[in-house]
Design a protein with these regions (language model features):
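Anion-binding alpha/beta catalytic cores of soluble intermediary-metabolism enzymes, centered on
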Residues: 1-204
Length: 204
């Protein structure tokens, strides 16, 4: 199967679980939910969701992979002061656990931020997965779907960076432009993205 394996660490957030159910119903991705299965199924029942049983549910508190992931976290971060004890504790954080699943090759991506701040979402990704080679500036991109097909690609725009680097310099802006175009190609399937750079003159 060429379906992407997507981790959802915020499994008890209602919008997240509903989106997971929709993705499972449409068979557009393999979904990995992080959390306690009983709590996840209880919320699914409350929300009337029918497809959550098709997801892989992993509870860091009981998973046989937890010790392996904790050791990986320790190895990745020991030069930054990580200890085995700290790693054993931090691996229980769903955001860290999800990034470790990806780093181990057991998943392809993670979606979070419904309950977590941008900083909380990015921190484990930067510590564990890190930036692509040659990229030193972290940036975010969002898909904007409009009702106006002449905008972007059939009404879809990819906008970056709106959340991560508040006052980028020229070099950072160049990297953000390149990364946003790559996101437009890989995520939004744009054939040949046109990049426009906008700058506001003063703060509001």
């Amino acid at each position: 199967s060429n379906k992407q394996r997507i981790v959802l660490p915020e499994s008890l957030e209602e919008r997240t679980l509903t989106a997971a159910d929709m993705a499972l119903a449409d068979e557009i991705a393999e979904i990995i939910l992080i959390g306690n299965p009983d709590e996840i199924f209880a919320l699914a029942e409350k929300l009337g969701l029918k497809n959550i049983g098709k997801a892989t549910i992993i509870d860091p508190a009981t998973s046989e992979k937890t010790a392996e992931y904790a050791n990986l976290l320790y190895e990745l971060r020991k030069n930054k002061g990580m200890t085995p004890e700290k790693a054993a504790q931090q691996v229980l954080d769903p955001l860290y656990f999800g990034c470790l699943i990806i780093k181990s090759g057991d998943a392809d991506g993670q979606i979070s931020g419904a309950l977590s701040t941008t900083g909380e979402t990015l921190r484990p990704a930067l510590q564990i997965i890190k930036c692509s080679p040659g990229i030193t500036c972290v940036s975010g991109a969002m898909l904007m779907i409009t009702q106006t097909p002449e905008y972007g690609e059939n009404g879809v725009l990819v906008v970056g960076d709106v959340a991560v680097t508040p006052m980028p310099d020229a070099s950072q802006l160049a990297q953000i432009a390149v990364c946003t175009a790559q996101t437009a190609k890989s995520v939004a399937r744009f054939a040949d993205p046109n990049v426009a750079m906008l700058k506001k003159k003063k703060k509001f």
